[in-house]
């Protein structure tokens, strides 16, 4: 959430930001509501001052034995007017809050201006895509032939975009989760195992609500939402709290199942496990001093990259342009892994700096020193990594001519095998 004072004083700047993002927000309504709110507050303050002054006068008249009935009647009218204004003010402030919550974050100056993913800027590459000397297969064909992915039964039991992982496929998924968490905890992240359902306040805190309610699964008749990412519960771990400056930075890593409606993905990635309603992910979340957040973003991205390097999977890093930037982010790097069946790089991690956008929504602050005014922390998060897409990338990049899949060396202690065979 942007600071209301900042929006008021920089309406043109915010309007320009929305244009660069290729989106809209009701700034005219914000201006109208904000002006009306300030007028009412000023009027109420004047009425309260008048009531206080006249209340003293009523006391003087009563002590003098004089009639104060007219002034008392006038004060009742003033009190009724104040009550009416207070009710109007509550309605205005509620709507104003909704308007402010609908305005996205300001992109950092280093974010390239562009319309969509075609305007994202490549930063670096690691590894060379494998050149196959046989006709390679997509992961969905490999998985069915090896009997480690069962799409038909996933669809029967749940519906489209659900999959059973079986045998070595399930073990590969579990091994990746353990490997990733082990690596990140060695890098100073504290492991968290979060709830997979959260309330609406948590979703507002990280920016999923109110704008993206259609992308989430809500438990009917409750205030519970299935989490789209562990970012939501882990960021809200410190909601409405004040951290000590000496405790910053705070690093957390969390495994969770993730649940997404994929409302805008009709017809995209209908085969395989690239785009599922339920998938597993290891998430990295940071709470840092505002002066350090962009430095911490570089470290976070490198931490996610290390996983792909250890798995020896080719990838590239791109900076998202303004038109492709997520709602809450000030700057995002996407890490994209090479997928032979798609003949391109596909996103496997997004690493973002939200600055104080989420912290302001969630009320997460820190005290620079004892007795000092509390300030908002900066929050960051990134996938470290998406498990299903990592499984798919391993299957496609490590496949053999006989249909088997070589297990990456770093995973063999977790898997207890070198090759997944038919």
UniProtKB/Swiss-Prot annotation:
Reaction(s) the record says it catalyses: tRNA(Ser) + L-serine + ATP = L-seryl-tRNA(Ser) + AMP + diphosphate + H(+); tRNA(Sec) + L-serine + ATP = L-seryl-tRNA(Sec) + AMP + diphosphate + H(+)
In short, the EC number is 6.1.1.11
Asked if Ligase is a keyword of the record, the answer is yes
Q: What keywords are assigned to this protein? A: Aminoacyl-tRNA synthetase, ATP-binding, Cytoplasm, Ligase, Nucleotide-binding, Protein biosynthesis
Q: Which InterPro entries match?
A: aa-tRNA-synt_IIb, aa-tRNA-synth_II, aa-tRNA-synth_II/BPL/LPL, Ser-tRNA-ligase_type_1, Ser-tRNA-synth_1_N, SerRS_1_N_sf, SerRS_core, tRNA-bd_arm
Q: Where does L-serine bind?
A: 229-231, 283, 383
Which residues bind ATP per the record? 260-262, 347-350
Leader sequence residues: none
Q: Could you tell me which CDD domains the record lists for this protein?
A: SerRS_core (cd00770)
Per the similarity annotation, which family is this?
Answer: Belongs to the class-II aminoacyl-tRNA synthetase family. Type-1 seryl-tRNA synthetase subfamily.
According to its record, what is known about the domains? Answer: Consists of two distinct domains, a catalytic core and a N-terminal extension that is involved in tRNA binding.
Q: What does this protein do?
A: Catalyzes the attachment of serine to tRNA(Ser). Is also able to aminoacylate tRNA(Sec) with serine, to form the misacylated tRNA L-seryl-tRNA(Sec), which will be further converted into selenocysteinyl-tRNA(Sec).
The name under which this protein is listed is Serine--tRNA ligase
